[in-house]
């Protein structure tokens, strides 16, 4: 007969009418009983022949992905002109006095941030914008280009101008070496790029000769020179051969020749000196691509009147006859002045050699589930986290639930600050630019590659493609609608572009680490400046707490002014005042302790409503269910151990079938949530110890011992002793010498025992006491006669790695011992 829910509850000692604990609890450690219960609840039967269920409520598993929804009316968010002050350490020191070693180290990490991957894979420009929405290709292309343009205008991206130079908007940092420093700076650099000076100077010829010894493939080199691109080292990189602005077009060959000869007009003496063997008219240098000339600065030797000689793909339509009612020339002729082919930033700097490639693709999604009106750019730099050359990102400590509760559960008033575009505050060194490239190959290539018009694709490498091969009704209608949104920017956005990150991007594993270091250092400074208040951060979420509302408001004003003086942009509309219950990291934290936020409780209820019984559920769906239930597990009676059968099925990659009893058990567990309370400091006066055959307790001056009916594994025996100590004494601070009991992770014990022990020991704090000093050591070995002196072991609540009381460094700094005795648990501990 299957086990009923009531019987199962009684078995786990969750009901009050259970017998004496010393008899009942050791039974739960019995392997035979655990196996029988698992069979009764159908937990062990992992091989099932019925088809798996792949969807439970909103949770989907294998073979199904959520279809992203494209919104043609997405607004591109605006970015303030974010510029974090370079002398941030000096400004903090003016505010709070000398910084601690920790604060200084963290702030130096991000001024500027550096990124050196082992290997960088370069992808063709066509992969720059991902075809994420096949139905809305053109629309998505322009929206993404507009987003990238907005980021560039806000000083978040560099624009690659030539192989060795980039331009950007906004205020420069000292490590961004300006191009206009005069001739001296060029001698130290391996690249000769001149942004403003005239094109053929002797300086460059000197330069080229010096580099020529390294060149074997001179043919590629001559082909690379166009406009301002003086890429010398490019020949080393066979992947970086194509000129920067490449667009297949009707006049591909002719334009290319013109550009070759035109660029020779300015540099012929230099050219011939450096490359005597290379002919300027190389037939194969043009693979059907028009070379664009927007790389030339407006005041260079080429005059404005010559521009029509090298028309760009977009403007070529102006002179051609419409091929149909949907010809692109009809759109191009709507405007007389389409504006420049390219924009250049306010500052030009030197960068390491950057090929005309991208290293990651981009696409747009909704800003968040609650805001579908605005878009968010997703950058896929996952190449750095994959494969043999993956970068192992630095680990950083995040406070666990208990530490967080100890820190923040108090009778303070709270408010949270919203840092706008937090990642884009942290500057990246220009040396990282070649590794973090995004961009696009221009509209013509994008449409050609993704259109069903095979003529375009076939013509790319053979005969000259016809300009009007691109015209189609879909493209015409899309562009006409986009023309109403973007106007003459359609022309600018239809050109190829390559952008590198100037601030840290979100798609790299290094960024969360750097952001966490930055905000925690700033909060540490604020805590020392206002010792009677509390400031705490997780990523970009910063919270302030103070004793009264008036006090909090004045703290808010002072901290806001301080953050603004550092160049940190706050979003005043999103400042939230929480009163005494702080909503933070998915929890509600008040003076009673922590509970999950209401929306998570609703999600759990919804999950149980949709959870089928007696049907095998795909283990991928089980992962999603465990993710949700695991978040709230610390607030239930049995905690994580209750989810162990689910964990086991996920590990063995088998389907899981919920029996009615197990589902009812979990459902009841999650309907009544108990707050996790903050730990209080105190003295430990109750000690527990065990041997495989017996247990012993010391409570004040009272000592007890007992034996087990059969020998047990030592960890199990120690856990039982701790449970007896708690139930006998009611004390919430217990001394033990077992590291597993100390860790309060009961998932490795027999399943029923783990569930019962979690409930008995809920809210208990443990203090480590070495075996040699443990007063309960003798009773556990059956010796009650000898009485050891009672230890006075103080218990201090843990706050993880967050030091709330960092000593200001005017005191001579010495590092205190973290742990005062060789605790196996603390030695082996890694940040969660």
Curated annotation (Swiss-Prot):
Changing residue 470 to S: In strain: Latvia. It catalyses: DNA(n) + a 2'-deoxyribonucleoside 5'-triphosphate = DNA(n+1) + diphosphate; Endonucleolytic cleavage to 5'-phosphomonoester. One of its GO terms (biological process) is symbiont-mediated suppression of host innate immune response. Activated by host HSP70 and HSP40 in vitro to be able to bind the epsilon loop of the pgRNA. Because deletion of the RNase H region renders the protein partly chaperone-independent, the chaperones may be needed indirectly to relieve occlusion of the RNA-binding site by this domain. Inhibited by several reverse-transcriptase inhibitors: Lamivudine, Adefovir and Entecavir. Changing residue 330 to H: In strain: Latvia. Keywords: DNA replication, DNA-binding, DNA-directed DNA polymerase, Endonuclease, Host-virus interaction, Hydrolase, Inhibition of host innate immune response by virus, Inhibition of host RLR pathway by virus, Magnesium, Metal-binding, Multifunctional enzyme, Nuclease, Nucleotidyltransferase, RNA-directed DNA polymerase, Transferase, Viral immunoevasion. Residues 1-177 are annotated as: Terminal protein domain (TP). Residues 186-225 are annotated as: Disordered. The record marks 63 as: Priming of reverse-transcription by covalently linking the first nucleotide of the (-)DNA. The keyword Isomerase does not apply. Mg(2+) binds at residues 418, 540-541. Residues 346-589 form the Reverse transcriptase domain. Transmembrane segments: none annotated. Residues 336-679 are annotated as: Polymerase/reverse transcriptase domain (RT). Changing residue 356 to A: In strain: Latvia. One of its GO terms (molecular function) is DNA binding. Its EC number is 2.7.7.7, 2.7.7.49, 3.1.26.4. Residues 178-335 are annotated as: Spacer. Changing residue 266 to Y: In strain: Latvia. PANTHER family: POL PROTEIN, RIBONUCLEASE H. Belongs to the hepadnaviridae P protein family. HAMAP family: HBV_DPOL. Terminal protein domain (TP) is hepadnavirus-specific. Spacer domain is highly variable and separates the TP and RT domains. Polymerase/reverse-transcriptase domain (RT) and ribonuclease H domain (RH) are similar to retrovirus reverse transcriptase/RNase H. This is Protein P. It comes from Hepatitis B virus genotype D subtype ayw (isolate France/Tiollais/1979). The lineage of its organism: Viruses, Riboviria, Pararnavirae, Artverviricota, Revtraviricetes.
